[in-house]
């Protein structure tokens, strides 16, 4: 999948059919006698069934056949959604339950996405990178290889205005928990961002920054490496 620029994302969202996907549990006396709309996936037995489809299609169908159902329960998690969730089945990475990843996201081999992470359209995650619990990668956020994005960290997204630059995190970067990296910031290779930092300016390669706003503390040294080294065993599949 090619990297999406802001205008491509805007076009994708603007032209995509807006859908309200629902799952409908039904009970009746003779469900197999019903003819379901072609757009609906129907898994029915004689007296019970489950229907998958768009509410715009299923709502009138259920109303028309109200007398055929003894009970109906509707579940839905989105309304007029333009971007579905990413199909994870063939992604060569470890993705834990509860992560929310939208379509048009690139995830490199052996990456790790932890519970509660949210990754928006157009984001890219490099090989062997870990996105920790509750981290948020906004639209078009770019993260290189073998990074660690700490729990609760926010990499601000940029979809509009279309001319804005995304957050760019180079290879081998460690960002501590609950840090914020604002739009357009470039964090250089091997840098370390301390927990809770708010990064408003570019970070030079192999430097340590901390504070609000984040400021240069020192160059990465052996002591820093000993405290921030990543564990490759966590990235094995």
From Swiss-Prot:
It is an enzyme of class 2 (transferase). InterPro entries: DapH, DapH_N, Hexapep, Hexapep_transf_CS, Trans_hexapeptide_repeat, Trimer_LpxA-like_sf. It holds the Pfam family Hexapep. It comes from the Bacteria. The keyword Amino-acid biosynthesis applies. Its EC number is 2.3.1.89. The keyword Nucleotidyltransferase does not apply. It catalyses: (S)-2,3,4,5-tetrahydrodipicolinate + acetyl-CoA + H2O = L-2-acetamido-6-oxoheptanedioate + CoA. Pathway: Amino-acid biosynthesis; L-lysine biosynthesis via DAP pathway; LL-2,6-diaminopimelate from (S)-tetrahydrodipicolinate (acetylase route): step 1/3. Keywords: Acyltransferase, Amino-acid biosynthesis, Diaminopimelate biosynthesis, Lysine biosynthesis, Repeat, Transferase. SUPFAM superfamilies: Trimeric LpxA-like enzymes. One of its GO terms (molecular function) is tetrahydrodipicolinate N-acetyltransferase activity. One of its GO terms (biological process) is diaminopimelate biosynthetic process. NCBIfam families: DapD_Ac. HAMAP family: DapH. Belongs to the transferase hexapeptide repeat family. DapH subfamily. Catalyzes the transfer of an acetyl group from acetyl-CoA to tetrahydrodipicolinate. This is 2,3,4,5-tetrahydropyridine-2,6-dicarboxylate N-acetyltransferase. It comes from Limosilactobacillus fermentum (strain NBRC 3956 / LMG 18251).
